[in-house]
C-alpha cells in the first residue's frame, strides 16, 4: 500500500482474526519510522467499544502458552500498550489462575525507586522508565510477560527483556504478546536472556520502502521535546508501581449528564486503564460508549487517521499531544479522564469537543 512517504508491503502468515478487523495504517511524522500501524481494538487512535477491547485482550491472553510458570510479571509498554497490557494480565490470570503481577513502563518521573531504564529505538520518545514494584519479591518471579500493541522488529521487547531480566534472578521464561507481530519468524527471540516465545492475533512480515521525496521530518527541536520526561508529584498508582491480578481499582462516582446516552471516554497519555474500566461500567449501564486516548505520536491525516486535534500535554511537559478521529459533530458527549491535577487538561481540547474533564484523584478514588 502507498502511504505517500513510501510503500508498505505485508505478508500474513497466520491470523486468528481478519487484518482489517484489527488494524489500519497511516503515515506519521517520524524520521525513525514513517508509517504507523493503527489498531482498531486498542482504544487509542480509533474509537472502539470497551467490550470489543476486552474481547481482543481475552483472545490474546488465550493465545499465550498455558504452562507459563508463576509468579508471572506482566509488563505493558507505555504509552500505547498500558491498557492492553493490564487487560491481558487480568484475563490471563482469570483464565489460568496462579499468582500474577502487572507493571508498566512510563515516561513520567515519580518519587519511587527506579528498577531500570531502556530505549525504544524507533519511537519519537525513546526513553522508558521502569519503577520497582511495591509488594513483590522480584526473586520469586519465574515468567516475564511483555505486552506491546505490535511488534515490528522485536528490538524494543528484546531491549526491555534484557533490562528487566537482570533484576529477576529466578526468571525461567519470557513470553511476548502483541495484537500484531510483523517480525517475520521471531529471530529476535534468540537474543532474549531466557527461553522466549511470542504470541499474537496476526503474524506476518512487513517491508517498508521509503519514497525518494517525502514530506519534511519534524525539526530536531521537536525530537528533543518529544523525548522529555514528565513528572508527577502526587501519584495515582494504576500500574507504575505494580498491581496484583484481581486488585480492586476505585473509580469516580460518575454519571453522564441527563439524556446523554452516546459517550466518548478519553484516556490521557499513559492513564488509560482506569478510564477503560469506567467506560466498561458505563457500557454495562446501557450507554453507547467508545474509548480513545490522547497520544504523543504525531500522525498525518490519511488512511486510518482522519480528524486530528493538537493541544498541550496535561503532564506539564512541552510535548505536543494529539487526539485522532474525534469530532464534536458526531454527537457524543466526551469525558476526558486524567490523573494530573484539576485544571491540567488543555482547555483547547475540552472546548474542541464540548467535553468535560474528569479527575481520578478526588474523593472516592484511591490515590
Where are these regions (language model features)?
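PRPP-associated nucleotide enzymes
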Residues: 1-367
Amino acid at each position: 500500500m502507498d502511504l505517500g512517504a513510501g510503500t508498505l508491503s505485508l505478508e500474513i502468515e497466520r491470523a486468528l482474526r481478519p487484518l482489517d478487523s484489527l488494524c489500519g495504517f497511516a503515515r506519521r511524522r517520524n524520521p525513525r519510522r514513517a508509517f504507523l500501524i493503527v489498531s482498531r481494538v486498542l482504544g487509542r487512535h480509533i474509537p472502539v467499544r470497551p467490550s470489543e477491547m476486552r474481547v481482543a485482550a481475552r483472545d490474546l491472553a488465550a493465545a499465550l502458552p498455558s504452562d507459563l510458570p508463576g509468579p508471572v510479571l506482566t509488563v505493558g509498554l507505555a504509552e500505547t500498550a498500558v491498557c492492553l497490557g493490564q487487560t491481558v494480565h487480568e484475563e490471563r490470570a482469570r483464565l489460568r489462575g496462579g499468582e500474577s503481577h502487572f507493571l508498566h513502563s512510563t515516561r513520567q518521573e515519580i518519587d519511587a525507586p527506579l528498577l531500570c531504564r531502556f530505549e525504544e529505538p524507533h519511537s519519537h520518545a525513546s526513553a522508558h522508565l521502569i519503577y520497582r514494584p511495591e509488594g513483590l519479591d522480584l526473586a520469586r518471579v519465574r515468567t516475564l510477560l511483555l505486552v506491546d500493541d505490535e511488534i515490528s522488529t522485536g528490538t524494543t521487547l528484546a531491549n526491555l527483556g534484557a533490562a528487566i531480566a537482570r533484576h529477576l534472578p529466578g526468571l525461567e521464561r519470557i513470553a511476548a504478546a502483541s495484537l500484531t507481530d510483523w517480525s517475520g519468524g521471531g529471530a529476535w527471540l534468540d537474543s532474549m536472556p531466557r527461553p522466549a516465545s511470542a504470541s499474537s492475533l496476526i503474524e506476518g512480515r512487513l517491508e517498508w520502502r521509503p519514497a525518494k521525496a517525502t514530506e519534511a521530518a519534524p525539526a530536531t527541536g521537536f525530537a528533543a521535546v518529544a523525548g522529555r520526561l514528565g513528572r508527577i508529584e502526587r501519584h495515582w498508582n494504576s500500574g507504575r508501581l505494580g498491581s496484583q491480578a484481581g486488585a480492586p481499582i476505585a473509580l469516580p462516582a460518575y454519571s453522564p449528564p441527563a439524556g446523554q446516552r452516546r459517550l466518548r471516554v478519553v484516556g490521557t497519555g499513559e492513564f488509560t486503564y482506569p478510564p477503560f474500566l469506567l467506560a466498561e461500567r458505563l457500557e454495562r449501564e446501557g450507554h453507547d460508549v467508545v474509548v480513545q486516548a490522547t497520544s504523543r505520536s504525531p500522525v498525518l491525516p490519511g488512511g486510518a487517521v482522519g480528524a486530528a486535534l493538537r493541544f498541550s500535554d496535561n503532564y506539564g511537559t512541552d510535548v505536543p499531544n494529539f487526539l485522532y478521529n474525534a469530532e464534536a459533530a458526531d454527537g457524543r458527549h466526551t469525558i476526558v479522564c486524567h490523573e494530573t491535577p484539576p485544571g491540567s487538561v488543555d482547555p483547547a481540547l475540552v472546548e474542541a469537543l464540548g467535553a468535560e474533564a474528569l479527575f481520578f484523584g478526588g474523593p472516592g478514588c484511591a490515590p
